[in-house]
Amino acid sequence: MNLDSLIPQKDKLENHPIFTRINSIEELVIFMEHHVFAVWDFMSLLKKLQKDLVPMGSPWLPNPNGNLVRFINEIVMEEESDVAYNQNGDTEYTSHYQIYLDAMNEVGASTDSIENFLERVQNTGIHKARTCQAIPSPSHKLMRHTLELIEN
């Protein structure tokens, strides 16, 4: 892959309007309380891709597309076990989701909505859980779209 071809997309991302819209801790808190659902949503989509494109099972069978297998597994590895540092500065491994929750706690954002949602997912399943009123509307819309992709 020619990495220079990504420069326009990188510039576009670096100049995204979101970076001019968040001007205070209060605005960051609101953003994070919404965005955490997208962080979780991405993992759900990624795990679906892993399940469909990099099937796991026993007995193991070779996958003819090694590049795709590596690409998906590298993303999963980073998302599920990225480097983090504990309060003593020691290296630990944890998910991006957990790193995000830790950052939310650091700025004073509430994790109640996402934690309640995930508890409902575990106890009642995704379809009942996503009717939770505490999910911000834009997050609900994103998750509905992702679940449609996952189920089809």
Task: Annotate each language-model stretch with its function.
Residues R70, E74-N152:
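Active-site-proximal alpha-helical scaffolds that flank and shape metal-associated catalytic sites
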Residues M1-L13, N23-L61, E74, E78-V83:
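Alpha-helical bundle segments that constitute or directly flank the non-heme di-iron/ferroxidase center
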